[in-house]
C-alpha cells in the first residue's frame, strides 16, 4: 500500500502565524520533534523564517542562529529532516549536518545556487509555487509552467526527478478563488512526473472553508479535510501542524484508496 508521507511543521521562530515562539529553543524543539515522531511524522520540516503576512525578513545570520542548533540536535533521530529555507547558505550548512531535504518556498528563483547545493549533497528538494500575485495567464496554467520550468532547472543541476517535489503554494500569491481553483485541479499537478506535497495547514484557505472567524488551532479538522481531498487527488505528502490527526486520517484514506484501486483492477 502506498503511504502518504506526513511532514510535521517545526517553526523555530518567534513570529510564525500559528505557533511562533513555542519551539524556538533547542529543548522545546527536541521535545516537539519526539512527540511528532510518536504521532506518525515521516518528515520534520524545520523553519527559521516566518512566512505569515506582514512578517519581517530576518538576516542570514539570524536564520542560521535559529535553525542550526535545532538541526544539529535532531538530525540523528529516526525521521527525515527537511529545512524550510530559500537561502543556499542555510541549505548548505544544514545539508552538511545531514538533513535530507530542502523546502524552498521560492522554488530556486530567489537563490540560483540552491539547485547546485542540493545536488551536491544528493538531497531532495521541494519547489513551491510563489510570486507577486500578478500573472498573464490563469493561475493553474501559470503554476504548472513555473514549477515545471524550475523542476527542469533542478534536473539540469543534477537532482533526479524522484527527488524533486512540487508544492502548489496554497496561501502564497493567490486570491481566495485562485486557491480554490488550484485545489480543484490538483490532479493536473499530480499528473506531472513529480511527487506532490500539499501544505494547507491552518492557513487562510482553511479559515475561509469554515466561513467564520477561527484561531489557527481551530482549523485542524478542516485541514484534515484538505488532507483527505489531496490524497484522493493523488498527492504524496502533506505538511501539517497537527501530526496525529492527519497521520490517522491519511492511514484511513490510504487504505480506502488502495481498496478502491484493487476493486477496479479486478473488474
Swiss-Prot record:
Mg(2+) binds at residue 11. It holds the Pfam family Pterin_bind. GO terms for biological process: folic acid biosynthetic process; tetrahydrofolate biosynthetic process. Its EC number is 2.5.1.15. Its cofactor is Mg(2+). It catalyses: (7,8-dihydropterin-6-yl)methyl diphosphate + 4-aminobenzoate = 7,8-dihydropteroate + diphosphate. GO terms for cellular component: cytosol. InterPro entries: DHP_synth-like, DHP_synth_dom, Dihydropteroate_synth-like_sf, Pterin-binding_dom. Keywords: Folate biosynthesis, Magnesium, Metal-binding, Transferase. It is an enzyme of class 2 (transferase). Pathway: Cofactor biosynthesis; tetrahydrofolate biosynthesis; 7,8-dihydrofolate from 2-amino-4-hydroxy-6-hydroxymethyl-7,8-dihydropteridine diphosphate and 4-aminobenzoate: step 1/2. Residues 1-251 form the Pterin-binding domain. (7,8-dihydropterin-6-yl)methyl diphosphate binds at residues 51, 84, 103, 167, 203, 239-241. Homodimer. PANTHER family: FOLATE SYNTHESIS PROTEINS, FOLIC ACID SYNTHESIS PROTEIN FOL1. Belongs to the DHPS family. This is Dihydropteroate synthase. It comes from Staphylococcus aureus (strain Mu50 / ATCC 700699).
Amino acid at each position: 500500500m502506498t503511504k502518504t508521507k506526513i511532514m510535521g511543521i517545526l517553526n523555530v521562530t518567534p513570529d510564525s502565524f500559528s505557533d511562533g515562539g513555542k519551539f524556538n529553543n533547542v529543548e522545546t524543539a527536541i521535545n516537539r520533534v519526539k512527540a511528532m515522531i510518536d504521532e506518525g511524522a515521516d518528515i520534520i520540516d524545520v523553519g527559521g523564517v516566518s512566512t505569515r503576512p506582514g512578517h519581517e525578513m530576518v538576516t542570514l545570520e539570524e536564520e542560521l542562529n535559529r535553525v542550526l542548533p535545532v538541526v544539529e540536535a535532531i538530525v540523528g533521530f529516526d525521521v527525515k529532516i527537511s529545512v524550510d529555507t530559500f537561502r543556499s547558505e542555510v541549505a548548505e550548512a544544514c545539508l552538511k549536518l545531514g538533513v535530507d531535504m530542502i523546502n524552498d518556498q521560492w522554488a530556486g528563483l530567489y537563490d540560483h545556487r540552491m539547485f547546485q547545493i542540493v545536488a551536491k549533497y544528493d538531497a531532495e528538494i521541494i519547489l513551491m509555487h510563489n510570486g507577486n500575485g500578478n500573472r498573464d495567464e490563469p493561475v493553474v496554467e501559470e503554476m504548472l509552467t513555473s514549477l515545471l520550468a524550475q523542476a527542469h532547472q533542478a534536473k539540469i543541476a543534477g537532482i533526479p526527478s524522484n527527488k524533486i517535489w512540487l508544492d502548489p503554494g496554497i496561501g502564497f500569491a493567490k486570491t481566495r478563488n485562485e486557491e480554490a481553483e488550484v485545489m480543484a485541479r490538483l490532479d493536473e499537478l499530480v499528473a506531472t512526473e513529480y511527487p506532490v506535497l500539499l501544505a494547507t495547514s491552518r492557513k487562510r484557505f482553511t479559515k475561509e472553508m469554515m466561513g467564520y472567524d477561527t484561531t489557527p488551532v481551530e482549523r485542524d479538522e478542516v485541514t484534515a479535510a484538505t488532507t483527505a481531498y489531496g490524497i484522493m487527488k493523488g498527492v504524496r505528502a502533506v505538511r501539517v501542524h497537527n501530526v496525529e490527526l492527519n497521520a490517522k486520517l491519511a492511514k484511513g484514506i490510504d487504505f480506502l484508496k488502495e481498496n478502491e484501486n484493487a476493486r477496479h483492477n479486478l473488474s
